[in-house]
């Protein structure tokens, strides 16, 4: 049902191995080595690669007037860059789409921005496996293998969090863009060796009242740094785009 109205799917990654394997499983798909030529035939591009890849890809896509769905939302952390691609999108009629990702409560946050918001706070708890290989932790002398109890490894604003944890905290970028910005959004990251899920607790206070939303996510089997729900949110968004009906927008 999802792909009935889809005419063609183009798949691109750095090496092509994964896309070739996936293309073999999908009747309407083919693996390509460059996106530029295919943009003339695309209505929508879905980025699920990395922040650097997204930064490079977004201007090219919206510059052609093509919609793009971004999973690496941290690509939009730089204000000048974000304003530039937004302006390009307005001029070409393209849309920059950001799914809810691994976080529930974004609908309420979006609604609350119509009025005054006094505080937005995101508390994320992950198992050490989901935070491996981060230079910031090495620089701070934080050794994940030595942590035996829940430990706060970062507390500050979302702008710094997104830059220090580019593969782990895209939800902070989503919340910041939807809410009160990267500098005013508070982020706390906790490492818990006993955690079996990636949990995100979103607290929003404003003239509407107070909202607290907690999501306990099953980590992705292939990438524990992200959550299974993030992939599901992209699929859900794609379904709504294809159907042209948006319930709960």
Label every model-predicted segment:
Residues 1-2:
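Short, small-residue-biased leader/transition segments that mark boundaries at the very start
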Residues 6, 29, 64-67, 91-94:
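A short helix->loop->beta-strand "cap" motif at the edges of active sites that frequently abuts
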Residues 9:
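Short beta-strand element of Class I
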Residues 12-16:
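Residues in the short beta-alpha loop(s) of Rossmann-like NAD(P)-binding domains
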Residues 21-29:
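Short, conserved SAM-binding/catalytic segment
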Residues 30-63, 75-79:
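Beta-loop-alpha module in the N-terminal Rossmann-like domain of NAD(P)-dependent dehydrogenases
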Residues 59, 73-95:
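Rossmann-fold NAD(P)-binding glycine/threonine-rich loop
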Residues 96-97, 102-249:
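Active-site-lining helix/loop region of Rossmann-like oxidoreductase modules
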């Amino acid at each position: 049902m999802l792909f009935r109205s889809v005419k063609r799917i183009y798949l691109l990654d750095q090496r092509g191995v994964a896309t070739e394997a996936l293309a073999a499983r999908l009747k309407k798909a083919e693996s390509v080595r460059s996106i530029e030529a295919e943009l003339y035939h695309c209505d929508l591009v879905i980025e699920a690669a990395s922040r650097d890849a997204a930064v490079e890809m977004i201007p090219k896509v919206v510059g052609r007037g093509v919609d793009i769905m971004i999973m690496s939302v941290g690509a939009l952390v730089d204000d000048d860059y974000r304003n530039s691609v937004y302006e390009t999108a307005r001029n070409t009629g393209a849309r920059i789409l950001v799914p809810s990702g691994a976080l529930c409560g974004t609908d309420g946050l979006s609604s609350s921005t119509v009025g005054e918001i006094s505080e937005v706070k995101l508390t994320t708890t992950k198992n050490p496996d989901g935070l491996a290989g981060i230079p910031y932790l090495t620089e701070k002398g934080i050794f994940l293998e030595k942590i035996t109890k829940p430990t706060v490894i970062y507390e500050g604003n979302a702008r710094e969090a997104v830059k220090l944890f580019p593969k782990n905290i895209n939800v902070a970028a989503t919340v910041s863009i939807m809410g009160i910005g990267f500098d005013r959004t508070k982020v706390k990251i906790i490492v818990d060796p006993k955690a079996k899920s990636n949990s995100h607790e979103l607290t929003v206070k404003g003239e509407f009242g107070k909202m607290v939303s907690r999501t306990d996510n099953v980590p992705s089997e292939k990438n524990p740094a992200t959550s299974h729900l993030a992939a599901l949110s992209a699929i859900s968004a794609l379904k709504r785009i294809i159907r042209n009906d948006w319930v709960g927008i």
